Amino acid sequence: MTRLILPISLLALTLLAPTARAEMSAQDAAQVARIRQAQLMTAMFDLRKSRLGFEETVTAIRLSAGKKGWRVGPTQDAQADMARAGVKDAPRIKVIPTCPPEANQRLARISQASGKPIPPLPCRVTVLIDKDGHVQVIKMNTAHLARAAKFDQLAHVMGEIAAEEEAMLKGIVE
């Protein structure tokens, strides 16, 4: 009798387990999605605390990029844009369009030579005040993208761009 109970119990557990897993996944799907999104955001973006005040950080980034020969476009006041769109208590956010010289041209040449599509870099540095009142600088995590590149030539160029970005932010971020 006990020989039959164990196999029957295992069979019942095997048949019921997918149902329990399906119920658990339905209950935890939103949490799993949030965790995966947070992991993706952590990998994609480089967020660092500034050593300076808000406006000083914006000015320092613009000056540092300009000294290095980067193109620097007009700073977008995202807080003002959100306020005009009706957002109350919009956080302080400024977006500085800037990129190392010919960064996207270098990527385009690799794309053309390899026949593989490579999207351009967004070439933006964002300065914001977080919920704790700290000035933060956020940009694309080019160093991570370089490590994740599927072929050597792309990894090399992305690594160079990451080093240029790091040099531009030296002394501004922690």
Language-model segment annotations:
Residues 1-4:
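Positively charged n-region of N-terminal signal peptides that target proteins for export
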Residues 7-16:
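Bacterial N-terminal signal peptides
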Residues 18-22:
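Sec/Tat signal peptide C-region and signal peptidase I cleavage site
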Residues 23-73, 81:
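Terminal, regulation- and interaction-focused segments at domain boundaries
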Residues 61, 76-78, 99-102, 131, ...:
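A mature extracytoplasmic/lumenal domain signature
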Residues 66-74, 78-121:
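Compact, glycine-rich, soluble single-domain proteins
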Residues 124-151:
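Beta-strand/loop substructures that line and gate deep hydrophobic ligand-binding cavities in soluble
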Residues 143-174:
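C-terminal partner/receptor-binding element of secreted or periplasmic proteins
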